[in-house]
From Swiss-Prot:
Expressed by the venom gland. It comes from Phoneutria nigriventer (Brazilian armed spider). It is found in: Secreted. Residues 1-21 form the signal peptide. Pfam families: Toxin_9 (PF02819). This is Omega-ctenitoxin-Pn1a. CDD domains: Spider_toxin (cd12960). Gene3D superfamilies: 4.10.40.10. GO terms for cellular component: extracellular region.
């Protein structure tokens, strides 16, 4: 009986350690957030102090250079590109 209890406790401990060792896949994971900051998607803010545009898209700014947004490439308007 004592051996069964020890084996049971060992199994519970290993399961608990396995659950704790899983990588954090939550949306608040710092690694995912850092990766997301690598480039700005379509119609997202870009430019000075912000991320560059993904897929070499142009970063278009207003006249005051204050509101910069990633825009589509010319070829993307015709269904080309990625």
């Amino acid at each position: 009986m004592w051996l069964k209890i020890q084996v049971f406790l060992l199994a519970i401990t290993l399961i608990t350690l396995g659950i704790q060792a899983e990588p954090n896949s939550s949306p608040n994971n710092p690694l995912i957030e850092e990766e997301a900051r690598a480039c700005a998607g379509l119609y997202k803010k870009c430019g000075k102090g912000a991320s560059p545009c993904c897929e070499d898209r142009p970063c278009k700014c207003d006249l005051a250079m204050g509101n910069c947004i990633c825009k589509k490439k010319f070829i993307e308007f015709f269904g080309g590109g990625k």
